[in-house]
Amino acid sequence: MKPTRRRFLQANLLGGVAATFPFSTLGADSTAAGQGSYNPRYRRLDEILKEPVLKREFFSTPIIIESLELLRYKDSFLCRVRSRDGAEGISVGHSGLNALYPIFTHNLQQFFIGKDARDLDLLLEKVFIYGFNFRYNGISIGTPLATIEFAILDLLGRVAGKSLGQLIGDVQQPEVTVYQATEYREKSVEESLELIKRDVAEYNAHALKIKIGGLMFMTTDINAVGPPGRTEKIIPLIRKTFGDSMALFADANGFYSVDEAIRVGKLLEEYRYGFFEEPVMFDWREETRQVASALQLPIALGEQEYSLHGFRWVIANDAVEIVQPDNYYFGGMVRSMQVARMAAAFGKKCTPHMSGGGLGFLYMMHFVSVLSNPMPHHEFKGLRTNVQFECKTSPLKVVDGKIRVPTGPGLGVEIDPGFIGKHQRISG
């Protein structure tokens, strides 16, 4: 990374699959990095990917998975896992399971039955091979797989008396500092500003991310475009409105071409934004690198990335300074931690993308709590949830821009048995 980009990152942010997956090193790029898989940077990342994530030393005897269930009540999904010796874990599924639950029941569920939960790292590798599951990729397999992993981690945490974070790392952030993520791309600048001010005020946010560009994902109108000139107007207006003390970030969701991304990136630099998320489409890795090379502004990426190999490339080739694996979309905390470790090896930061709904904010908090290379602020979309639960170790309120991470075993909360009881088992 250029030294000036490193200084930009520090000044603006602080101030304001390879060895683990047999297919992941095939086709490694040999142009940008020079020597493909033999490049020293790739070799370093491959060594990191060999390192276990789950702290198996907490468990002296096998923990055999006896049952794994997906439960549904209307649009709510829970995963419940039980071991042969009676231990139980539960997770809250992503709303995307409305469309994806058949992959849970048909492609993943049976694979885990009878396995030792202590082998979680290996299970998360081999499940992609089972039934050629790697053909599905992306959120289609990542979301149901994460739902399973979260439940297994909850079970293991309860057995060991450890939080989810403690199972995959050492707690370094007992509180997570958040940024308010906002939407409103399709609305006028004036209406967007009022809604953003409302969101910031609700949680007294000290950091904020806005949407830019014109990706009209919310409509079936193939001719839809965003309000003319919205991006060019809102970037300086947000800085003027919230002042120099507010940390600002921007997300294009892959809308721009390389040239347009560079143009908009320079405007973001002028108004001291902290990072530019997905300036071009997520799988345009070489184009992302071109944008990064032209800007001092750090580039962030990872919400849509579905492979360890993809993250390996963008890290090794300095296409990004910030990685953003989504714990749900990417298949869980173990895989996301592998990404964070790769990033740390080359001085890059990690801040997970956070899916809204359910208890996504809790999984995000546990993950961030053990990062060695966290960003100063992490994505937050509010505390609203349909899940009925109790947390005895944290008020789960935003205070001075921070939320205290639960310290109880597993997820650190107790989901209301009555709420669980409303859910019915989905059979294959």
Where are these regions (language model features)?
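N-terminal export signals
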Residues: 1-2, 7-34
